[in-house]
Each structure stands twice: as structure tokens, then as C-alpha cells.
């Protein structure tokens, strides 16, 4: 009989308040990407994108509708990264958009508090 690590599928809801306005004539058009730090077979780690929200047009306080699915593994420390960008074009390359900030935490923090609130860092 094989041992299975306890795991649950969860869906992350994301919102932000008081984002920096990077647009001149209108408000920012934010999108949030969600990544998890994954351990590779060679022992190294890399950020793997789990998904992204939709763009919320003309908003500094977006409440994103699209939920991000991920597997919560009870016995692992799963580091998460949330990055918010101001979408400025139809390009799918994030480097073509203004970076508004990021936040890192462990998935267990989100699950245990049910509503985690943290400041963004890396604002330019």
C-alpha cells in the first residue's frame, strides 16, 4: 500500500487596495499573477506560475473574480508569490507592463487565517 501525502484542492480569491496609479489619463488596469516555489528533482527550486487573474480595468482597488486553483499539501511549506502589474497593451509578456508590486507568503498562512492581508513590496 502506497502512502499518500494529505492534499486539498483550494481556490485563491485575490483583491488589492490602494494600488499605485501608473497611468496618466486613467487609473491603472491591474492583473495579478500567482506562482509557487517548486522543488526540482535536482534539489534546486524555481517559481512556477499557477495562474493569473483577469484584468480589472481602471481600478486602484481591484477585486478579482477569477479564482486561482492550487493544491495545498499539508506537510509541505509551499511558498507563494503574488505579483501585480498595470496592463498597458495587449501583450502577454509581463515585462511590457508596469510592475506595481509583489507579496510573498506561505500557503499555510492563507489557509490558517482564511483572509491574509499583506503590503506589496518592490513598488517602483
Which residues does each predicted region cover?
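Extracellular Ig-like/FN3 beta-sandwich strand-entry sites
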Residues: 75-79
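Intrinsically disordered, low-complexity PEST-like regions enriched in Ser/Thr and acidic residues
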Residues: 1-4
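Calcium-regulated, polybasic anionic-phospholipid
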Residues: 6-59, 88
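Short, flexible loop/turn segments at beta-strand junctions in immunoglobulin-like
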Residues: 23, 70-74
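C2 and C2-like phospholipid-binding beta-sandwich domains
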Residues: 31, 48-70, 81-124
Amino acid at each position: 500500500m502506497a502512502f499518500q501525502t494529505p492534499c486539498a484542492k483550494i481556490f485563491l480569491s485575490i483583491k488589492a487596495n490602494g494600488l499605485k496609479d501608473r497611468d496618466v489619463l486613467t487609473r491603472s488596469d491591474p492583473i495579478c499573477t500567482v506562482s509557487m516555489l517548486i522543488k526540482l528533482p535536482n534539489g534546486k527550486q524555481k517559481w512556477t506560475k499557477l495562474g493569473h487573474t483577469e484584468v480589472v480595468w481602471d481600478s486602484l482597488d481591484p477585486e478579482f473574480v477569477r479564482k486561482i486553483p492550487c493544491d495545498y499539501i499539508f506537510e509541505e511549506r509551499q511558498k507563494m508569490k503574488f505579483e501585480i502589474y498595470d496592463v498597458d497593451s495587449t501583450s502577454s509578456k509581463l515585462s511590457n507592463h508596469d510592475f506595481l508590486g509583489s507579496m510573498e507568503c506561505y500557503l499555510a498562512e492563507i489557509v490558517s487565517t482564511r483572509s491574509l492581508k499583506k503590503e506589496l513590496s518592490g513598488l517602483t
